[in-house]
Amino acid sequence: RIKDIRILKDAKDMVYLNVGRNDIKDITCLKDMKQLEIISLENNNVKDLTPLTELTNLCDVDLYNNVIEDLTPLEHLEFISYLRLDHNAITDLTPLSKLKYLRSLTLKANYITDATPLKDLELLEALRLDDNPIQDTSVLESMKFYEKFTN
């Protein structure tokens, strides 16, 4: 299992990166990979997404099964269209409200109680919120694609 990905720090022209199913905690070396479009970091121990803040070409992001709590570093990555964040420690979806091109979002098994920040994501076609303690589902019911999910 890979724990350290610092060897990638000079791969600035990389477009696709899959380092899923490892034991990676620190993704600081990714901060200068401005060409990245697809990144797969699933099944690691990533908590801090700050290094992704300026990776504005990202469109497909797999971050499920990590220890992520704060989504703020993703809020300006407006071209993300596919985002997988299942099995993390997320409570606040507010940063995702700015991702206007988001088409598919999976957030199963987090600690989300309010889905209101997602209500204006007009291109969203698929949303999974299973196993979250969402208190008021009325905002979801008003979304055009709403499909029943279970808590």
Please identify what each model-predicted range represents.
Residues R1-K3, I7, K12-K25, C29, ...:
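Concave beta-strand-loop units of leucine-rich repeat
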